[in-house]
Amino acid sequence: MNAIANLAATPRADLGECLADLAVDALIDEAELSPKPALVDRRGNGAHADLHLGLMQASALSLWPCFKEMADAAQRHARIDARLRGVLGQLGREGEVAMLRTTEGVNSHRGAIWALGLLVAAAALAPRRTQAGEVAARAGRIALLDDPAAASGDSHGERVRRRYGVGGAREEARLGFPRAVRHGLPQLWRSRESGAGEQNARLDALLAIMSVLDDTCVLHRAGRVGLAAMQEGARAVLAAGGSASLAGRRRLRELDRRLLALNASPGGAADLLAACLFLDRLPAALGGWAGSL
């Protein structure tokens, strides 16, 4: 990739490698988490005819150079402005090309490139300040800047935004990822504190996001009916005690069947779960970097 060639020399220490590792690990852990309603996981393809777990893993790995270069660019530039936004946009597009080459044209992680790319850059800008809300707010400040080289919006997500009047991934980022920071992460921590295992805590975090997100992936596939089924079903699982309880597990199976019948896959919520996992691990991962930067 050559988009950041003019952003000066190699950063001190390899913060970029650490952040790229965290981002890729978050994507792989999200993909492998099971049983997720209507999403690719260890059981199968969910509502996706063109995706499977191996492809999701390979796609995530293909994005490591993209995330590293985003972190390096932010660390070199050291401030949020239009120039950094343009560089990150170009790197994201190059990362998307690498992803599509790996998946032979299947869009497996376009939304994740956007969300995790912003968070990686935000973390690199201030590696001593790793509190989730602060990192997400910095990412939001980057997202508020326009990318002059971005293509005109005619993606599925853009069309859904216009049709249904929802904010989508762009607004979620510009607001500082509130569904991840205010819903997903608190639920992850609550479930851990209540004694749930890590996989159940992550499932509960996903459900908390699903319960409040206007997921454009679901709206694209199943409209308002699908969105209501996702949100109400996720709330029902949590109200029944979460994915670690017998009643919650029954509700989770019902939600999975309902979303599969509607061909509604909550891909936006999955991207935000990966963002949660990244933010959750960030303080421990960067604790050793603070003294050397």
From Swiss-Prot:
Enzyme kind, highest EC tier: transferase
Membrane spanning residue stretches: none
One Gene Ontology molecular-function label: ATP binding
InterPro entries: CitG (IPR002736), TriPribosyl-deP-CoA_syn (IPR017555)
Gene3D superfamilies referenced in this protein's UniProt entry, alphabetically: Triphosphoribosyl-dephospho-CoA protein
Top-level taxonomic group: Bacteria
UniProt key word Metal-binding: no
E.C. numbers: 2.4.2.52
Lyase recorded as keyword: no
Function: Involved in the formation of 2-(5''-phosphoribosyl)-3'-dephosphocoenzyme-A, the prosthetic group of the acyl-carrier protein of the malonate decarboxylase.
HAMAP family: MdcB
Protein family membership: Belongs to the CitG/MdcB family.
Protein name, as recorded: Probable 2-(5''-triphosphoribosyl)-3'-dephosphocoenzyme-A synthase
Organism: Pseudomonas paraeruginosa (strain DSM 24068 / PA7) (Pseudomonas aeruginosa (strain PA7))
Gene: mdcB
